[in-house]
Regions:
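Positively charged, low-complexity/disordered segments
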Residues: 1-9
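Cysteine-centered catalytic environments shared across enzyme families
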Residues: 8-9, 13-203
């Protein structure tokens, strides 16, 4: 699936596999090129992160987390993310400034946490396929999943003919959804739940 994500010459292919989950990624490495290989782990390797994007305020967050006792082994913004999740859980999202789509797997309870930035600059899609949860930044990667049977989503066509736009979370492919901007997703015990964490306010 990750092979379908073709990027520039600077893109690096990363992967993680266990008996419960497989995670693949292609990323543009621009910070701490040698140490920034993914996946990124927390101290006891109970959390595994795959991350696409950039956290603008990662240095400030890193300092705060170090003061809280977290140990860092790289200068990357991705390592800041995993320690932030370990420290603050879902609440860490409101501390972030940047563009991002990331997934964190808990190796102890088997759960998967996925989040997308406030404004949806970085894409994220997901599907339940024959009892398995599949996610990717681009739909074409999910289409490569062997058990997914490509099927047109007529509901999306109705939206498009009415608005010239597919109303999210629907996509043109049946069973494939986009994670909305400013939302996070939990996959636990075979169930998917999505929650809005950010809503713009105007004063």
């Amino acid at each position: 699936m990750s092979a379908s994500l073709v990027g520039s010459e600077m893109c690096i292919r990363d992967s993680y596999t266990s008996d419960k989950i497989s995670m693949g990624f292609r990323r543009l490495s621009i910070i701490d090129l040698d140490a920034g290989s993914q996946p990124i782990y927390n101290e006891d390797k109970s959390l595994v992160l795959m991350f696409n994007g950039e956290i603008y305020n990662y240095k400030d967050l890193r300092k705060e987390l170090m003061e809280a006792g977290h140990k860092f082994y790289t200068q990357t913004d991705s390592e800041v993310l995993i320690h932030a999740f370990e420290e603050w859980g879902e609440d860490m999202l409101m501390k972030l400034r940047g563009m991002f789509g990331f997934a964190i797997h808990n190796t102890k309870d088997g759960s998967l946490f996925i989040a997308r930035d406030f404004f949806g600059i970085k894409p994220m899609h997901y599907a339940m396929v024959d009892g398995s949860f599949v996610y990717a930044s681009e739909i074409k990667s999910i289409l490569e999943y062997p058990k997914y049977k490509k099927k047109f989503n007529h509901k999306a066509l109705d939206n498009y003919l009415s608005f010239q736009y597919v109303v999210p979370p629907e996509t043109f492919f049946e069973g494939i959804y986009c994670l909305l901007p400013g939302h996070y997703l939990w996959y636990r015990d075979g169930k998917v739940t999505t929650t809005r964490y950010f809503e713009a306010t105007f004063k």
